[in-house]
C-alpha cells in the first residue's frame, strides 16, 4: 500500500508551520483541502530540526488512544538507520477505512442533523394529526370503518325511529356515517303526546337541517301561551324579537312529523331503515357489539356495529342494560280531539289551572285541537269502557274549561274517541357502557306539561353530533365510551333546566287543600301577570330559548318571595307569617328534590366534572 506523508514547512514570512496533505490522500478530502487552500496557521509544536521526531511514535500516540492498537494502521520508519538526516520523514500507512472515517466525519455530522429534523417533523405531524382526530380515540387510518368481526360495513346501529332515532340517523348519515336503523313499526304512529315543539326545539331542528319536516304536515305556529284560572286569563308571548320571523313553536300530528323525518333519513344512501324488533344487545367481554332482532318475517338476525344508540322510547325494554332507571308515573293524560274549535288565543297553547290538575289545549292542524286532561296519580283513573271516563269529563272537567271551548269539548267526549297514556318521569342515570349509548325518552323523561321532551332530545342530538363529528373511527369502544362520558355532562344544564321546570310547574299547578300550596299557586299566576321580566323570564325558560339553571332557581324563588310579600302586606300577623314560612319551605320542597335527582354539580357546575374536559381535546 502506498504510504501517506504528513509534511511540515515553515513559512518564510510568518515563521508559522503549515500542514498540508500528501498527494496520497484523496483530492476530495475536504478537511485538508481546507487547510491547504487557505494555509491556516498552526502553532509550531516542534522545530524543523526535530521534525524527525514526528515519526511513528508520535502518530501512535495520536491514533492509538482513539482507535486502539490493532492492525488498522502500520507505522514504518523510512530513515534507513540514517540518524544524521534531520529532514527525514516518517511514513505512516493507514488503512483505507480510517481515511474514509476522517474524510466523511463532517458529512456524517450534517446528515445526522438533517435526519434528526426530519424525524422530529414526522413525529410532530403524526402527533398533531392524532390530536385533531380525537385525542387518541382514533386508532386506525380507516375512515369511518366498522371492525366487528363481521363485514357489515355499518358504523352505527340506531334502535328506534321515533323523533330521536330518525333525527339522529339523518344527522349521523349527513356526517358520512353508515347507519342501520331498526324500528319496530314503520307505519305512521298515532300518539297523543309529542305534538308541541317549543321554539328552542325548533332552533335545534334548524341546526340539524330538519326544519322542512314541519312543512306540508299542516303544522301550526305557536307564539305563546294563554293561562286561565278562576275566570281570569293572561297571555304570555315567547320572547322572539331577536330571532327571524320563521322562529316559533310548532304543533302538529306527531305521526306526520315522525314520518317526514323517517323519509328524510331514508333518502340518504348510507342509511338502511329496516322494520324489526330488537330483543337484546350483543355483548362480548363487557362491550356491546351490536343487537339481536327479529325482522318483519320473524327471522332472528344479528347486526353489528362499533356503536349502538338505543332510542326505543318511553317503554324501552333495553334501557336496563345501559342505566339504572327510576321511572315515576305522576299522572295520566286523557286525550281528545276537538274539531272546528276556535281557541280564545290564536296560535297559542292554552293551560287551564283546573281542579285537581291542569288541562291543555293546542291546535295540531288547521281544523283540530288537541285536549289533554291530566289525572293525578293519587286519583283513580276512570274507566273508558264502562262510561266512567265520559261521565268524569262532562261533570268535573267540562265546567272548568273556557266558555268558547265548552261545546266542542262536550261534542268530543260524546264521540267517545278517548285515549289515555301514563305520564312518565325519569332522571338520566347513565351507566357508561362501551359500544352503546341511550338517547331520547329511553334515557330521560319529564312530565309533558311543558312540552319540553322533543327540545331535550334534539339538543342531545346536537351535542352528540358535535362530539362524534371529529372522530373518523369508532372501533375503540372503551376509549370512545370514556370520551363520550362528556356527553352526559355537557347536556346537563339544558336538559336539567327543562326537566326541573316541568316537574316543578306541574306540582305548583296542581290543586291542593293545603293553604301554603294554594298561596304558591296563586302567587305563580299573579307573578306571571306582572309582565316584563316576570313573564319573559319564565316563558324563555319554558320555550327552551334560555334554559339556564340559575335563571330557573331565581324565578322560582322570586315567585315564592312574591307570595310571602303578599301575605305580609299590609300588616303581617303571626298566622300569615307562619303561612309564609310554610310557603318558602314548600317551594324548596318542590324544586330541590328534582334538582337533586338531576344532579346539582352537573347542573350548576359542569366545568368541575372531569369528564367535561374530555371534549376539549377534540374541540
Regions found by a protein language model. Give the residues of each.
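Short, low-complexity, Lys/Arg-enriched N-terminal segments of secretory-pathway carbohydrate enzymes
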Residues: 1-100, 129-139
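C-terminal helical "tail/cap" subdomain of flavin- and related membrane-associated enzymes
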Residues: 109-113, 117-126, 410, 466-619
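A short, basic/flexible loop-to-alpha-helix module at the beginning of a structural domain
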Residues: 119-153, 298, 441
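Beta1/beta-strand and adjacent pyrophosphate-binding region of the FAD-binding site
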Residues: 144-164, 180
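Predominantly flavin-linked oxidoreductase catalytic cores and closely associated redox partners
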Residues: 147-151, 264-401
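Glycine-rich FAD pyrophosphate-binding loop
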Residues: 157-161, 170-193
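A conserved beta-strand/loop capping segment in the N-terminal third of enzymes
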Residues: 200-262, 284-287, 294
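FAD/FMN-dependent oxidoreductases across multiple families
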Residues: 381-488
Amino acid at each position: 500500500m502506498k504510504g501517506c506523508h504528513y509534511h511540515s514547512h515553515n513559512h518564510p514570512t510568518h515563521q508559522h508551520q503549515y500542514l498540508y496533505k500528501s498527494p496520497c490522500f484523496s483530492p476530495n478530502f475536504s478537511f485538508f483541502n481546507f487547510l491547504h487552500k487557505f494555509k491556516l496557521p498552526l502553532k509550531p509544536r516542534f522545530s524543523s530540526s526535530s521534525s524527525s521526531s514526528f515519526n511513528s511514535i508520535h502518530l501512535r500516540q495520536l491514533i492509538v488512544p482513539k482507535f486502539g492498537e490493532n492492525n488498522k494502521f502500520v507505522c514504518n520508519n523510512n530513515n534507513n538507520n540514517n540518524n544524521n538526516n534531520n529532514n527525514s520523514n516518517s511514513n505512516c500507512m493507514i488503512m483505507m477505512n480510517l481515511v474514509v472515517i476522517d474524510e466523511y466525519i463532517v458529512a456524517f455530522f450534517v446528515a445526522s442533523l438533517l435526519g434528526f429534523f426530519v424525524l422530529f417533523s414526522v413525529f410532530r405531524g403524526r402527533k398533531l394529526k392524532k390530536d385533531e382526530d380525537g385525542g387518541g380515540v382514533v386508532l386506525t387510518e380507516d375512515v369511518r370503518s366498522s371492525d366487528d368481526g363481521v363485514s357489515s360495513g355499518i358504523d352505527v346501529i340506531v334502535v328506534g325511529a321515533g323523533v330521536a332515532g330518525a333525527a339522529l340517523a339523518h344527522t349521523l348519515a349527513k356526517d358520512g356515517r353508515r347507519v342501520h336503523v331498526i324500528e319496530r313499526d314503520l307505519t305512521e304512529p298515532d300518539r297523543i303526546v309529542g305534538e308541541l315543539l317549543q321554539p328552542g326545539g325548533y332552533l335545534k331542528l334548524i341546526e340539524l337541517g330538519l326544519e322542512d319536516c314541519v312543512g306540508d304536515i299542516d303544522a301550526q305556529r305557536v307564539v305563546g301561551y294563554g293561562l286561565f284560572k278562576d275566570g281570569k286569563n293572561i297571555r304570555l308571548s315567547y320572547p322572539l324579537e331577536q330571532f327571524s320571523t320563521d322562529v316559533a313553536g310548532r304543533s302538529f300530528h306527531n305521526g306526520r312529523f315522525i314520518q317526514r323525518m323517517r323519509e328524510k333519513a331514508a333518502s340518504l344512501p348510507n342509511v338502511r331503515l329496516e322494520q324489526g324488533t330488537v330483543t337484546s344487545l350483543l355483548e362480548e367481554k363487557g362491550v356491546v357489539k351490536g343487537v339481536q332482532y327479529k325482522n318483519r318475517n320473524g327471522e332472528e338476525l344479528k347486526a353489528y356495529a362499533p356503536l349502538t344508540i338505543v332510542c326505543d322510547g318511553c317503554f324501552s325494554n333495553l334501557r336496563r342494560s345501559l342505566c339504572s332507571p327510576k321511572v315515576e308515573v305522576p299522572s295520566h293524560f286523557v286525550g281528545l280531539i276537538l274539531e272546528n274549535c276556535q281557541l280564545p288565543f290564536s296560535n297559542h297553547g292554552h293551560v287551564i289551572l283546573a281542579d285537581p290538575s291542569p288541562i291543555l289545549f293546542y291546535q295540531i292542524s288547521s281544523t283540530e285541537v288537541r285536549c289533554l286532561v291530566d289525572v293525578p296519580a293519587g286519583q283513580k283513573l276512570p274507566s273508558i269502557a264502562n262510561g266512567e271516563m265520559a261521565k268524569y269529563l262532562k261533570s268535573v272537567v267540562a265546567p272548568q274549561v273556557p266558555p268558547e271551548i265548552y261545546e266542542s269539548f262536550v261534542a268530543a267526549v260524546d264521540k267517545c274517541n278517548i285515549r289515555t297514556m301514563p305520564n312518565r318521569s325519569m332522571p338520566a342515570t347513565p351507566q357508561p357502557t362501551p359500544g352503546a349509548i341511550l338517547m331520547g325518552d329511553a334515557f330521560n323523561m319529564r312530565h309533558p306539561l311543558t312540552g319540553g321532551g322533543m327540545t331535550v332530545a334534539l339538543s342531545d342530538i346536537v351535542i352528540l353530533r358535535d362530539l362524534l363529528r371529529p372522530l373518523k373511527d369508532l372501533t375503540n369502544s372503551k376509549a370512545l365510551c370514556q370520551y363520550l362520558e362528556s356527553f352526559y355532562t355537557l347536556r346537563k344544564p339544558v336538559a336539567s333546566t327543562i326537566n326541573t321546570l316541568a316537574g316543578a310547574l306541574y306540582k305548583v299547578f296542581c290543586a291542593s287543600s293545603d293553604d301554603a300550596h294554594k298561596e304558591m299557586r296563586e302567587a305563580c299566576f299573579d307573578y306571571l301577570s306582572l309582565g316584563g321580566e316576570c313573564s319573559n323570564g319564565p316563558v324563555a325558560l319554558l320555550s327552551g330559548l334560555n334554559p339556564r339553571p340559575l335563571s330557573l332557581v331565581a324565578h322560582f324563588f322570586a315567585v315564592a318571595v312574591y307570595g310571602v310579600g303578599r301575605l305580609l302586606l299590609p300588616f303581617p300577623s303571626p298566622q300569615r307569617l307562619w303561612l309564609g314560612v310554610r310557603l318558602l319551605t314548600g317551594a324548596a320542597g318542590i324544586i330541590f328534590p328534582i334538582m337533586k335527582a338531576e344532579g346539582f354539580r352537573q347542573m350548576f357546575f359542569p366545568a368541575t366534572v372531569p369528564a367535561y374536559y374530555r371534549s376539549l381535546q377534540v374541540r
